Amino acid sequence: MKYIFETRMMVRDYECDIEGIVNNANYLHYTEHTRHLFLKECGLSFAEMHRKGIDAVVARMNLKFKTPLQCDDEFISRLALKKDGIKYVFTQDIFRASDEKLCFPGVIDIVCRVNG
């Protein structure tokens, strides 16, 4: 996989559930944050796009939870992108930084709505 963007983050204690691992919903926050940072690096902003009448929305997600992250783990969120018709397909993989173990592979399809 050829990634075009990556960012490092840390697991915060409030993101973990009773088992001491990251709650599944937080992986979606991590991938969304990565997309926001990527677009910002490209000179784009979701807020500015919205003001111009363009809303990028998630159309589909294919997710796998492979290896759980735990409190204080540092991880790397990597992103690849391809255009497929009217959708943008983001391949987003999360790796534990200490050993590069794949924790969460995901494919997220984004479509843009124009003026509603």
What is each PLM-predicted segment?
Residues 1-6, 60, 74-76, 87-89:
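Intrinsic-disorder/low-complexity, polar/charged segments enriched in Ser/Thr/Lys/Arg/Asp/Glu/Gln
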Residues 1-58, 114-116:
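Hot-dog-fold acyl-thioester-processing enzymes
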Residues 3, 65, 70-71, 81-116:
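HotDog/MaoC-like acyl-thioester-processing domains
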Residues 15, 62, 109:
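Short aromatic/hydrophobic contact patches that present stacked aromatics
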Residues 26-30, 47-50, 77, 82, ...:
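Short, low-complexity, polar/charged sequence segments that are solvent-exposed and flexible
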Residues 39, 43, 75, 91, ...:
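Short linear functional motifs in flexible/disordered or boundary regions
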Residues 52-55, 59, 63-81:
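Helix-adjacent hinge/juxtasegments
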